Amino acid sequence: MLLFETVREMGHEQVLFCHGKNPEIKAIIAIHDTTLGPAMGATRLMPYVNEEAALKDALRLSRGMTYKAACANIPAGGGKAVIIANPENKTDDLLRAYGRFVNSLNGRFITGQDVNITPDDVRTISQETNHVVGVSEKSGGPAPITSLGVFLGIKAAVESRWQSKRLDGMKVAVQGLGNVGKNLCRHLHEHDVKLFVSDVDPAKAEEAKRLFGATVVEPTEIYSLDVDIFSPCALGGILNSHTIPFLQAQIIAGAANNQLENEQLHSQMLTRKGILYSPDYVINAGGLINVYNEMIGYDEEKAFKQVHNIYDTLLAIFDIAKEQGVTTNDAAKRLAEDRISNSKRSKSKAIAA
C-alpha cells in the first residue's frame, strides 16, 4: 500500500499511528473529514492478520462515518480507531495508554465502543480523556435506536420498490442476532413479517425462533433463501462476488457496516441483478445519532425524532439513483458530499465576510 497516495485518494485529513512500549500498544486513529464537526468514530480491538489490514479497516470505516454523519445531518465528521491486539491481552493499562493518545488530539476525535471494547472499557479509557461517548447509561445503549433506524430503512425500501407501506406477509432474512439484529426482529415480528434467521451462535438463533416464530437456517444458507428482503446485521464484506449470485431477495437493508466487499464492483453487481441496496452507512446511522445526542446532553425524544429522518433520506437516495442512473451507493455518496461541500462554501463565505 502506498500510504500517502491511499490517504489522498480516500480524502483523509490525518492518520495517527500510536505506539508505546510500556504497556505495548499499536493503534491507528484515522480522521477522514472534520468539515461538519469533530471526527466521531468508535474504537475496535482486533488481532488483525497484519498492519495493512488494520489500516484499511480504519481508513474505510472512518470515511464511512463521514458519509454517515452527513447523510444523518449530524454536525460531526468521520473517524475510526483500531487497536491491534488479541482481546485476551486487553488490560486497563493498555486502554488507558490508548486514552492518552485520544486525549492528545484535543477533541478533534471522539470515540466510543466497537468490537471487543465494552462499556467498562470505555469508562477505563475515560480516565485519561473526556473525548469519549458511552460512559453515561442515560441513552440505554445504541441497539434500540439503531434497530429502529434499520426498520424504518426497510420500510423506505419497500415503499420505493413496491409503492407499499405495508410489511405484513413479507419474508425477511436476518443475518446476525446480536443486540441490533434481535431488536430488528422484534420490530419486524410486530408487523407480521415472516422471519428467517441465522447466527454463528445457535443459542441466539433458537431464541429468535422462540420469541418471534422465526425459521432458523444455517449461516451458509441465508444468502440463497427465497425471501423479499435480506438484512445483514453481522459482519462486513458479506456482499461479494461469491454471495451476490446466490441472492434472491429484491431488497438489501441491514445494520452491518461495510457490507460491500468492493463498493464500486459489488454495488454495480447488485444494481444489474435488480436488487435495491440500502447503503449501510445511511440505514444504520441510529447508533451515531444516539452517541451524538449523548455527547450534547441526551434527549430521548430528540434522538428518536432524528432517527426517523433515515426514512426520508433513503427515499431521497433511491430517487437520486433512479434519476441519475447510478447505484444507490453512489447516490448516497453524492448526497453526503454535496452537504459537506455546501458547508465548506458557507464557511468560506463567512470568513470572506
From Swiss-Prot:
Catalytic temperature dependence: The activity significantly decreases to less than 20% of the original activity after 24 hours of incubation at 4 degrees Celsius.
Biotechnology and industry use: The mutant TrpDH-4mut (L59F/D168G/A234D/I296N) exhibits higher stability and specific activity than the wild-type enzyme, and could be used as a simple and rapid enzymatic method to determine L-tryptophan in human plasma samples, which is useful for the diagnosis and treatment of inherited metabolic disorders of L-tryptophan metabolism.
UniProt cross-references to PROSITE patterns, sorted A to Z: GLFV_DEHYDROGENASE
Catalyzed reactions per annotation: L-tryptophan + NAD(+) + H2O = indole-3-pyruvate + NH4(+) + NADH + H(+)
Enzyme Commission number: 1.4.1.19
SMART domains: ELFV_dehydrog
UniProt: NAD(+) binding residues: R44, D114, T146, G176, L177, G178, N179, V180, G181, K204, A255, A256, N257
GO function terms (MF aspect): L-leucine dehydrogenase activity; nucleotide binding
Gene3D superfamilies reported in the protein's UniProt record: Leucine Dehydrogenase, chain A, domain 1 (3.40.50.10860), NAD(P)-binding Rossmann-like Domain (3.40.50.720)
Family classification: Belongs to the Glu/Leu/Phe/Val dehydrogenases family.
Quaternary context: Homodimer.
Name this polypeptide is given: L-tryptophan dehydrogenase
Species name: Nostoc punctiforme (strain ATCC 29133 / PCC 73102)
